[in-house]
Amino acid sequence: MVAVVNRKYRASRRLGVNLWGRSKDPFNTRNYPPGQHGAMGYKKLSSFGRQFVAHQKFKCYYVVSSRQLRNVFLKAYRKKGDTGDNLVGALESRLASVVYSAGLVPTMFSARQLVSHKHVTVNGRVVNIPSFSVKPGDIVEVRKRASQLPMVLAAIQSQERRVPDHLDVNTEKLSVKYLAVPKYSDVPYPANMEVNLVVEFYSG
């Protein structure tokens, strides 16, 4: 797990942004790429380069593979409405994303771990699939046996992130009601995610 966290922060520096908005992100004090020549700074990117970085941001932020992100995009593209909004709505509807965005855990990695270890229920039923799609009206809750886990207690105490309006969180019950599928503009990303460039990347 430590190795995963280290790679996470390395990705933040590689992409040139404090991706998760965390105060302890090394990018806050070392805002240059990792590696031997990192101190030389970030290179100016081509149009494709900017698109590629934007798609990498989404991969890292939501902890999904290239294949997973592409599949989500294809579904968003085929759906009526704005493709960027559809993409973000689908990613934010993932169970791990709901747990993370609600502030019940400190990171997306810990959200995936909490779900995978059967510590989360949806409408009273245990769901251990991080990619499970939550629907408006669903109630997501951390099980009592996990309520005293250090990562849960730390997240509730710190309240490090602003909870988006599409989630109704009860910190005492460690539960969250999913009110609606959000659009890109509804999600308080700590970094500039440029979903339009992700759409261009996959549409090119």
From Swiss-Prot:
Name by which UniProt lists this protein: Small ribosomal subunit protein uS4
Gene: rpsD
Subunit structure: Part of the 30S ribosomal subunit. Contacts protein S5. The interaction surface between S4 and S5 is involved in control of translational fidelity.
Residue ranges constituting the S4 RNA-binding domain according to the UniProt record: 93-156
Role, per record: One of the primary rRNA binding proteins, it binds directly to 16S rRNA where it nucleates assembly of the body of the 30S subunit.
Cellular component, GO, one term: small ribosomal subunit
Pfam families, per database record: Ribosomal_S4, S4
Family designation: Belongs to the universal ribosomal protein uS4 family.
GO BP: ribosomal small subunit biogenesis; translation
Gene3D superfamilies linked to this entry: Ribosomal Protein S4 Delta 41, Chain A, domain 1, RNA-binding S4 domain
Keywords, alphabetical: Ribonucleoprotein, Ribosomal protein, RNA-binding, rRNA-binding
Any GO MF annotation of the entry: rRNA binding
Keyword Nucleotide-binding carried by entry: no
Species assigned in the record: Anaplasma phagocytophilum (strain HZ)
PROSITE patterns reported in the protein's UniProt record: RIBOSOMAL_S4, S4
InterPro entries recorded: Ribosomal_uS4 (IPR022801), Ribosomal_uS4_bac-type (IPR005709), Ribosomal_uS4_CS (IPR018079), Ribosomal_uS4_N (IPR001912), S4_RNA-bd (IPR002942), S4_RNA-bd_sf (IPR036986)
PANTHER family named in the record: 30S 40S RIBOSOMAL PROTEIN, SMALL RIBOSOMAL SUBUNIT PROTEIN US4M
